[in-house]
Amino acid sequence: MIKVEKFSDEISKAEVLVEALPYIKKFAGSIAVIKFGGNAMKDPQIKSMVAEDIVLMKYVGLNPVIVHGGGPDINKMLASLNIETKFVNGLRVTDEKVMEIVEMVLVGKINKEITSLINKTGGKAVGLSGKDANLLLAEKDLSQGDLGYVGKVVNVNREVILNLIEKDYIPVIAPCAIGRDWKTYNVNADIAAGKIASSLNADKFVLLTDVEGVLKNKEDEESVISRLSYREAKDLLNSQFITGGMIPKLKCCIQALEDGVKRAHIIDGRIPHALLLEIYTDKGVGTMIAKEVYDNDNL
């Protein structure tokens, strides 16, 4: 008689792989746009795990497209140069000097760090700015008044991304955009990622954040709502139940669904291997939003 207990660790690992099988089959050849931000970018260990998740996704047939932020690094660089920065309703006032620093940090530092880390982990990542081949076309965002070189994405040159995917590369995109006036614009990374996802008709749009997901009870971090329909998400937003930084993230997910993305996810990037757990397990670890959701449906 074989003593199963002797192989309990190995069996549990095999069970995880078997659980992932229908998801691997479902998403083979699909596109997932992942906004890489929050604590996942600050903690070196978590950052490495995210890179591992991204590379594994690629190897099992899902095509990840990475869009990253970099607010804390930009703040740090501006402070070191004694350049004052102001915000209006979450948008950075961006004059020409600030824009120069934003581009330097996003494109020259963070983008290259993420690209190098993915390559070191075994992937084939290519770092891009939204200015490359007019990847992200922006116009001035005047929603909060004239804040300088703050833009909103009005067009995505999807062919650039699709050509890279076809050749098995992983695009890593910094959210600096080009305007019709040939000026550089600072664009919100979450919104840019959503625009990229919709332009690619992505199956998945994932926001890596510093919160567990959408909560039933704001005082209870364990009360994550694992699945929301599009209608439920809109109702929550309109009910003013959602507050703070979750409002723009939920709006971003809703807009992505309206623009053709099949599934949007808000997950806690502080959880080790959160991407794999959300996409390739039945339960997931965050909140999935879809036009329609069904019981036990994480596909």
UniProtKB/Swiss-Prot annotation:
InterPro entries: AceGlu_kinase-like_sf, AcgluKinase_fam, ArgB, Asp/Glu/Uridylate_kinase, Glu/AcGlu_kinase, NAGK-C. Substrate binds at residues 70-71, 92, 186. NCBIfam families: argB. Pathway: Amino-acid biosynthesis; L-arginine biosynthesis; N(2)-acetyl-L-ornithine from L-glutamate: step 2/4. GO terms for molecular function: acetylglutamate kinase activity; ATP binding. Belongs to the acetylglutamate kinase family. ArgB subfamily. This is Acetylglutamate kinase. The lineage of its organism: Bacteria, Thermotogati, Thermotogota, Thermotogae, Petrotogales. The keyword Transferase applies. It is an enzyme of class 2 (transferase). Its EC number is 2.7.2.8. The record marks 35, 249 as: Transition state stabilizer. Signal peptide: none annotated.
